[in-house]
């Protein structure tokens, strides 16, 4: 490994020294043959002899060209011949170069300013820091005696501290009694001791913090004064101090002096860079500061020296820790740039790029351009035409479509080959000519800059052209993946990055390279030109919705792999998150209120990157199958594993079953006991019994089951001692997969002579907590015993006896008897070893979060985390939770787990081989309080707050605090809405701390993720996206080209102009309202985790704000059930509900005579196109179309209703199932309540002919379980009285309303699926019917109770059974007379799911249902998804004069209204006059296709939004209002916190008048009215109060604003004023300074005070509106109240587009 290079002089000649570490030893290699040189371009080669005669003097020595040779090079891509001039010594070059340049025959000289040692590295292709050598590091720090006014190094050094891997020590020359302090006699002896320490320890790296400018210089000066030779170099030299700009830099020969200060200044943005501040920012831990005066006092008095020594020791220790943190990144940068770490760590970003390009130029035989002289620099900095700005016509505009180019300028650089070496190049066959400026760029070869940035992206466009030309769909797909992969070559991530994926529903943490490589081995990837693409299914990634910022699970469509050679960027965030990406791969950064894609090449320290606040993982009750785990082990590992089952009830079972199976397959005669086995097979679902026969339901499954019993019958053995059957696992290894779970549950599994356990473990809170204990402080061991066999042990450690008690209890619960030691619990069971090893790993370095934990219910995940924390966590003194582990996989697993629990406030650190995860949030099982003001990614950074609100903030702020301030009016709500996604979404921001660049050659990888095209990846989890960003130089760079920059901008203008011209000529948009649904429409929501069916009007609880005639109510914690584009039912956030009165037509859409939906004429429903309109292979989203009520029957014939279970699923308690079946029977055919004594204790049930069956299946099990006391037959045959006091009370309380009618309580909507199904089973068994109508199976529930029927429908939807409802038109009759009721039928649509999940208790109904469905199959394609279809029967206009409502559903913009999927608009649609909404959308998409087909290369236009109305001052100063009524302003002064209420209110009214009402004159009238009222003192003083905050100590204010003046007067009265105090004041009329006239508002007395009307008009109201109205030609004086009438500007202000 090369550490550094330099040169020395021997006999007047340079000798290159290469300092290396090789095989653990330091060595110096010498090269005496390398010569200094530069290049000269001559007018005539004959002049070379004259040039060789040129001389100059250097320190009395004559300097001249030693020799010259002619060489062929390229200059800006053009062939050129230059002379390479060699010299004797490197110092000859600066001495003679100007004289050579001035010779008339010399055109110019080149590469004369590259230092000799750096030139050597470039020319020889040597890369510093390359290799795997382990470097020894030593950090040191000094403490000095300083009194104010003393000269530098006048005072002595008091202490020298140093730290390395062995620890930290302090050397001093006063007695300090501490174990890490070495005391010597004098300062001189102390310095000598330190020099001896360095010599003995012989570190490769010396780490300092500002050692360049303090420590080394101070030591050197004191050493000189004391007569000590300050030898630190490995060559026996003293440190070399040299000037570097306005700072110094210190070299120690043979060692790398790594000064952290310039590195940290370049990497991290901090308000102060003290060692203490940096340490806390990096590691999240405070460090004590001892000030110079305190050190001096302690030294001179002898008191407190221990504190100083401890501080000195900690300085060295902290410097060492920081060095270890930053050194690897600087080493990677050194490898990439190809220069020494000493140089790289002290270089600016611009210099690093220069050195990188210089090396690349040498590799390509390119002559590097010279740096610009002052004249050239001035030329480069001259202005040129900027980007396109269309000066808008004054006035107000309607219907604004916003179109934008993605990455416009980088795309132009690559598309048009813009580069200095292609500029105006003669002799090319093809040029791209920049419009307007006329610069030509050769297209015959790739330019130097574009080729470094985007060679592969050019290839992508060729493939797109091939795609358009080919008609072969396979080739087209392959080419499509190829062009994606080519894009990804510059936009991919490296193989070692972590990636969480859901594979077949189970979350796995994988390295992306390993996962893609292994998956591709099993599949058949498509390959073209080295790009491999494998289409996959069953794999999902964690991503986020770009619009809503909500985390989503999205399918991975393909895995992509390609070889790559180029730059990679190592991006480290302040939380410790980290990812390596290729140059063009994007992360998501905060820019101007939004998240945008920013590439690795563009990301800089201080950027804020998107990381997850929460990830929404699927939840289910997990169950571990031990058999599956055992099957994953080799046979030798399971040779002693057996399965056992009790004999009771199974005598001769295995042989009897085998004989029966052979008989079924007609190989033997019918056994006498066949009925017994047939009944068992029927329970397993293999056969169906009839009165005199049976029917095979699944022949293939039965055949496999027989294979199992062939082995079982032969291999099973009888163990008489334990009265059990036993079979060796290995005997069943190949067939056990055929054993049904119902049978497997009855077996136990374990070792032959040891412990056995049930084969399934339910992952509940107890087991999860035990796993957490193990992962934190447990290990699993397998070792040889004395009998040469194997012993297995699992030990979990803890020193807290209460914790050990809990561990023992939990371990005993699952594994029987355990052993308790002093500080551990031991489970000596092989099955425990197998289980823990497979789920969690064994050693500290390979531990992991078990996969089953991630997808378990939230309470289970918390239980695991609690166990882990108790075992391996601690509560840091700063109140933060700290978790420690050596396992990188476990760290990432913990982060994903914490994110799934909604915790994002984490930091990850790595120290001494241990990862530490710090959590700064309150946890439910702890009483910790989060630490305030610490920067964690869950808070909103103050930089974001400042950008959003346009004012300074002292600290970061939590979303809750921000909301509180907005609600109080302290922060502007309109501005806050810009970052609403940051407050409410699943994204938080993490600051980029460091970006390191290096070279990489090998495979890079990417995923294609459906819809979102982003995924979670990297160490600590970041959101990554594939995109591209181009790089261009800066004005001082060698390769900068003013003509190139000018051309890129000109092309940008041209493309924007063309686009605008095209859209003006071909398209024109108008706006129409798109309204909502009626107030009594029921929507399905989940509020705070609970499912509700609520009338939409009930969601509207208050008016939070108004936009025009529309009223809005903000919602929190509310989600709506919706359907995504993949046909899945999902829950999505509802941020608000809107209502308004309408005069539009309201239509009632009837689906049956009892099921309808009321919508406005413009509201869209979601229709489903059948395969006659859209081919079946088309994506589902192309078949889901928006349709207006009057278009039903023409455009589409079917609408969508829900058809998938949304209730949670559990492992149900069998007795609880029976109880809910009974309750269902009671609601159907029961009676309860009343005032009799019987009613207090009994409920009645009419069973009819099914009494015996109901008793056997329901009543008897409930009696035996003690749920009911008893049951008795009544006088009427078939009736039963059930004795149960609690049940009688329960039924009265919950299942009858105040009128005594049966009902279903709302809590049932949140029961587990299994219990709802049990209730429905009982209900349908009582009141349901099964029939065949015209050959079609029919299942109905009949009632006369409409409310009950509606509630039953909701329960059916909850368990995934689609249904409808209709009412009989003929009234019911009783004894020949009309009863006044009509039968209401709930009709089952998805009959097969009903049969499978609900069915009937009664055999007669169950059999009839089975028979009816046997020949009836589900043919609906919709059943592949989570929905069913319904067909409107009738549409009619109705009278309706109340509010109509709409809800905003994030992501999908759809919700279920009365069970029908409808589209929620944001209030408005864009349209073309005379065309419907579908036409508008179609035309908009057609325009994008049209223009993008015309645009060359990578250029692509995107549809960014539609605005209802807006006005423009310049390109970057405008205000618009979108369809949601959201007002966006840019570049215009908007309300500030220090404005009074009158200013805020006036501005809001002005914007509303202009943007919502389209009336500028109204806006002007509003301002005049306010100024008039102010002038006449008619404005209430409450609206004039100004609130400003004191942000620092009063003594620190240099300027005294009104609030400071008031504060100082209050302080003078003894009122305490501290930073954070808000001063509320009002300005009074009078003369003098405003501060003198400002008084606290509570002292304002209207009887004796008058406010300063002129102040409020000029400094509050007019500034709030002036910039807005200036866009319409108004001046300040036009807006004030005037007694004489002013001529209006109405004609001029007429809204464009209005007739």
UniProtKB/Swiss-Prot annotation:
Disulfide bonds: none annotated. This protein undergoes a protein self splicing that involves a post-translational excision of the intervening region (intein) followed by peptide ligation. GO terms for biological process: DNA-templated DNA replication; intein-mediated protein splicing; intron homing. The keyword Nuclease applies. Residues 770-903, 1222-1361 form the DOD-type homing endonuclease domain. It catalyses: DNA(n) + a 2'-deoxyribonucleoside 5'-triphosphate = DNA(n+1) + diphosphate. One of its GO terms (molecular function) is nucleotide binding. Keywords: Autocatalytic cleavage, DNA replication, DNA-binding, DNA-directed DNA polymerase, Endonuclease, Exonuclease, Hydrolase, Intron homing, Multifunctional enzyme, Nuclease, Nucleotidyltransferase, Protein splicing, Repeat, Transferase. The keyword Nucleotidyltransferase applies. PROSITE patterns: INTEIN_C_TER, INTEIN_ENDONUCLEASE, INTEIN_N_TER. Transmembrane segments: none annotated. It holds the Pfam family DNA_pol_B. InterPro entries: DNA-dir_DNA_pol_B, DNA-dir_DNA_pol_B_exonuc, DNA-dir_DNA_pol_B_multi_dom, DNA/RNA_pol_sf, DNA_pol_B_thumb, DNA_pol_palm_dom_sf, DNA_pol_type-B, Hint_dom_C. Its EC number is 2.7.7.7, 3.1.-.-. It comes from the Archaea. In addition to polymerase activity, this DNA polymerase exhibits 3' to 5' exonuclease activity. Belongs to the DNA polymerase type-B family. This is DNA polymerase.
């Amino acid at each position: 490994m090369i550490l550094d290079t330099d040169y020395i002089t021997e006999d007047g000649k340079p000798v290159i020294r290469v300092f290396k570490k090789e095989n653990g030893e330091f060595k110096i290699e010498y090269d005496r043959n390398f010569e200094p040189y530069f290049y000269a371009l001559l007018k005539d080669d004959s002049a070379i002899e004259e040039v060789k005669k040129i001389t100059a003097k250097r320190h009395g020595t004559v300097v001249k060209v030693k020799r010259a040779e002619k060489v062929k090079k390229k200059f800006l891509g053009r062939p050129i011949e230059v002379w390479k001039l060699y010299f004797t010594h490197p110092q000859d070059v600066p001495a003679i170069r100007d004289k050579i340049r001035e010779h008339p025959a010399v055109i110019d000289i080149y590469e004369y300013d590259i230092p000799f040692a750096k030139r050597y590295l470039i020319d020889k292709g040597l890369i510093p820091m390359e290799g795997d050598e382990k470097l020894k590091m030593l950090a040191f720090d000094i403490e000095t005696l300083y009194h104010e006014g003393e000269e530098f190094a006048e005072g002595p050094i008091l202490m020298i501290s140093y730290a390395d891997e062995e620890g930290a020590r302090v050397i001093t020359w006063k007695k300090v009694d501490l174990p890490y302090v070495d005391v010597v006699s004098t300062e001189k002896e102390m310095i000598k001791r330190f020099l001896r320490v360095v010599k003995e320890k012989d570190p490769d790296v010396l780490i300092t913090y500002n050692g360049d400018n303090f420590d080394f210089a101070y030591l050197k000066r004191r050493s000189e004064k004391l007569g000590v030779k300050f030898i630190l170099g490995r060559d026996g030299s003293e440190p070399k101090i040299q000037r570097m700009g306005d700072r110094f830099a210190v070299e120690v020969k043979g060692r790398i002096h790594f000064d952290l200060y310039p590195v940290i200044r370049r990497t991290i943005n901090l308000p102060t860079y003290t060692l203490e501040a940096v340490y806390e920012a990096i590691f999240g831990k405070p460090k004590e500061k001892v000030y110079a005066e305190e050190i001096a006092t302690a030294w001179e008095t002898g008191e407190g020296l221990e504190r100083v020594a401890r501080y000195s020791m900690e300085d060295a220790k902290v410097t060492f820790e920081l060095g270890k943190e930053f050194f690897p990144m600087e080493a990677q940068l050194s490898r990439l740039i190809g220069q020494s770490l000493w140089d790289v760590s002290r270089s600016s970003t611009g210099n690093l790029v220069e050195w990188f390009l210089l090396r690349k130029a040498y590799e390509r035989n390119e002559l590097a351009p010279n740096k610009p002289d002052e004249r050239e620099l001035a030329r480069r900095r001259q202005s040129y035409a900027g980007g396109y700005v269309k000066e808008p016509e004054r006035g107000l505009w309607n219907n604004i479509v916003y179109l934008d180019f993605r990455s416009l300028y980088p795309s132009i650089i690559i598309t048009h080959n813009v580069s200095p070496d292609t500029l105006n190049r003669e002799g090319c066959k093809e040029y791209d000519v920049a419009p307007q400026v006329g610069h030509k760029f050769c297209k015959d070869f790739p330019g130097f800059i574009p080729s470094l940035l985007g060679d592969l992206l050019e290839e992508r466009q060729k493939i797109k052209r091939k795609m358009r030309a080919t008609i072969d769909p396979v080739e087209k797909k392959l080419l499509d993946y190829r062009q994606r992969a080519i894009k990804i070559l510059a936009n991919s991530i490296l193989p070692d990055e972590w990636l969480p994926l859901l594979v077949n529903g189970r979350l796995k943490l994988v390295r992306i390279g390993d996962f893609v490589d292994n998956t591709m081995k099993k599949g058949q990837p498509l390959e073209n030109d080295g790009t491999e693409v494998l289409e996959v299914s069953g794999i999902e990634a964690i991503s986020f919705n770009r619009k809503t910022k909500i985390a989503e699970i999205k399918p991975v469509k393909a895995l992509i792999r390609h070889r790559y050679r180029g730059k990679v960027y190592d991006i480290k965030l302040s939380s410790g998150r980290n990812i390596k990406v290729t140059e063009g791969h994007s992360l998501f950064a905060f820019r101007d209120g939004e998240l945008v894609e920013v590439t690795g090449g563009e990301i800089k320290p201080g950027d804020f990157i998107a990381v997850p606040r929460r990830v929404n993982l699927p939840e289910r009750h997990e169950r571990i199958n031990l058999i599956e785990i055992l099957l994953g082990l080799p046979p030798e590992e399971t040779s002693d594993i057996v399965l056992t089952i009790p004999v009771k009830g199974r005598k001769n079972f295995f042989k009897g079953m085998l004989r029966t199976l052979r008989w079924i397959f007609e190989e033997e005669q019918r056994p006498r006991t066949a009925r017994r086995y047939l009944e068992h097979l029927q329970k397993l679902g293999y056969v169906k019994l009839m009165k005199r026969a049976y029917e095979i339901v699944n022949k293939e499954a039965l055949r496999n089951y027989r294979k199992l019993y062939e082995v079982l019958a032969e291999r099973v053995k009888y163990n008489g001692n334990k009265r059990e059957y036993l079979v060796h696992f290995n005997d069943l290894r190949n067939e056990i997969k055929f054993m049904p779970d119902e049978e497997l549950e009855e077996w136990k599994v374990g070792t032959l002579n040891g412990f056995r356990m049930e084969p399934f473990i339910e992952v509940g809170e107890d087991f999860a907590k035990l796993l957490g204990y193990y992962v934190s402080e447990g290990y699993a061991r397998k070792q040889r015993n004395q009998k040469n066999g194997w012993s297995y042990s699992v030990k979990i450690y803890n020193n807290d006896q209460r914790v050990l008690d809990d561990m023992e209890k939990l371990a005993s619960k699952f594994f029987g008897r355990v052993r308790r030691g002093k500080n551990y619990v031991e489970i000596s069971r092989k099955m425990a070893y197998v289980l823990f090893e497979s789920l969690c790993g064994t050693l500290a370095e390979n531990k992991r979060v078990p996969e089953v934990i991630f997808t378990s219910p939230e309470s289970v995940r918390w239980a695991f985390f609690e166990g882990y924390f108790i075992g391996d966590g601690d509560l840091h003194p700063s109140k933060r939770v700290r978790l420690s582990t050596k396992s990188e996989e476990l760290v990432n697993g913990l982060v994903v787990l914490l994110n799934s629990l909604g915790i994002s406030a984490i930091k990850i650190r790595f120290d001494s081989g241990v990862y530490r995860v710090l959590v700064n949030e309150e946890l439910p099982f702890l009483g910790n309080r989060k630490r305030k003001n610490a920067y964690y990614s869950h808070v909103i950074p103050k930089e974001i707050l400042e950008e959003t609100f346009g004012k300074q903030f002292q600290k970061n702020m939590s979303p809750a605090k921000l909301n509180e301030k907005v609600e109080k009016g302290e922060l502007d709500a309109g501005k806050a809405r810009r970052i609403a996604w940051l407050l409410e979404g699943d994204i938080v921001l993490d600051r980029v701390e460091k970006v390191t660049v290096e070279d990489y050659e090998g495979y890079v990888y990417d995923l294609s993720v459906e819809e979102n095209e982003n995924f979670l990846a990297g160490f600590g989890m970041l959101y990554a996206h594939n995109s591209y960003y181009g790089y261009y130089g800066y004005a001082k760079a060698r390769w900068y080209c003013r003509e190139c920059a000018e051309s890129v901008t000109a092309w940008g203008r041209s493309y924007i102009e063309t686009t605008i011209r095209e859209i003006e000529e071909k398209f024109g948009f108008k706006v129409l309202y798109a309204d909502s649904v009626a107030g009594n429409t029921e929507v399905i929501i989940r509020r705070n985790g609970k499912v509700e069916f609520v009338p939409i009007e009930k969601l509207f609880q208050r008016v939070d704000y108004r936009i025009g005639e529309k009223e809005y109510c903000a919602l929190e914690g509310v989600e709506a059930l919706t359907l995504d584009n993949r046909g899945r039912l999902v829950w999505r956030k509802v941020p608000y509900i809107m209502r308004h009165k309408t005069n539009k037509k309201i239509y009632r859409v009837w689906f049956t005579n009892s099921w309808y939906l009321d919508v406005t004429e413009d509201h869209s429903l979601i229709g489903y196109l059948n395969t006659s309109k859209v081919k079946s292979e088309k994506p589902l989203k192309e078949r889901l179309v928006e349709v207006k009520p009057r278009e039903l029957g023409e455009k589409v014939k079917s609408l969508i209703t829900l058809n998938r279970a949304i209730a949670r699923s559990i492992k149900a308690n069998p007795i609880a199932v029976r109880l809910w079946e009974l309750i269902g029977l009671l609601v159907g055919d029961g009676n309860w309540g009343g005032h009799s004594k019987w009613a207090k204790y009994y409920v009645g049930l009419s069973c009819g002919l099914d009494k015996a069956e109901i008793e056997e299946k329901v009543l008897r099990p409930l009696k035996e379980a003690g749920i009911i006391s008893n049951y008795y037959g009544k006088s009427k045959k078939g009736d039963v009285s059930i004795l149960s006091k609690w049940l009688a009370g329960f039924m009265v309380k919950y299942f009858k309303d105040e009128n005594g009618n049966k009902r279903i309580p709302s809590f049932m909507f949140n029961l587990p699926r299994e219990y709802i199904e049990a209730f429905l089973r009982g209900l349908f068994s009582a009141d349901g019917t099964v029939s065949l109508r015209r050959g079609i199976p029919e299942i109905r529930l009949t009632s006369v109770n409409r409310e009950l029927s509606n509630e039953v429908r909701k329960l059916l939807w909850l368990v995934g059974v689609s249904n409808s409802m209709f009412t009989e038109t003929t009234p019911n009759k009783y004894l020949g007379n009309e009863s006044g009721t009509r039968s209401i039928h709930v009709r089952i649509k998805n009959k097969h799911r009903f049969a499978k999940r609900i069915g009937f208790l009664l055999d007669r109904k169950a059999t009839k249902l089975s028979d009816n469905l046997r020949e009836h199959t589900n043919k609906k394609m919709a059943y592949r998804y989570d929905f069913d279809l319904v067909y409107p029967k009738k549409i009619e206009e109705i009278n309706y004069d109340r509010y109509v409502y709409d809800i905003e559903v994030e992501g999908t913009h759809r919700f279920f209204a009365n069970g029908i999927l409808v589209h929620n608009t944001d209030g408005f649609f864009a349209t073309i006059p005379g065309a419907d909404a579908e036409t508008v959308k179609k035309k908009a998409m057609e325009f994008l296709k049209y223009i993008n087909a015309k645009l060359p290369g990578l250029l692509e236009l995107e549809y960014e939004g539609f605005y209802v109305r807006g006005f423009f001052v310049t390109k970057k100063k405008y205000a618009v209002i979108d369809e949601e009524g959201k007002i966006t302003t840019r570049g215009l002064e908007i309300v500030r916190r220090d404005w009074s209420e009158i200013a805020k209110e006036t501005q809001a009214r002005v914007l509303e008048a202009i943007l919502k009402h389209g009336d500028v004159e109204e806006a002007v009238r509003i301002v005049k009215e306010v100024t008039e009222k102010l002038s006449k003192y008619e404005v209430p003083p409450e609206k004039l109060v100004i609130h400003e905050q004191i942000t620092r100590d009063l003594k620190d204010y240099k300027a005294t604003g009104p609030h400071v003046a008031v504060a100082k007067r209050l302080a003078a009265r003894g009122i305490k004023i501290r930073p954070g105090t808000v001063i509320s004041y009002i300005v009074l009329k009078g003369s003098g300074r405003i501060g003198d006239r400002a008084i606290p508002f509570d002292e304002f007395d209207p009887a004796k005070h008058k406010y300063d009307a002129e102040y409020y008009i000029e400094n509050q109201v007019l500034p709030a509106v002036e910039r807005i109205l200036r866009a319409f030609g108004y001046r300040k004086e036009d807006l004030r109240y005037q007694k004489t009438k002013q001529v209006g500007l109405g004609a001029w202000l007429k809204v464009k587009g209005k007739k």
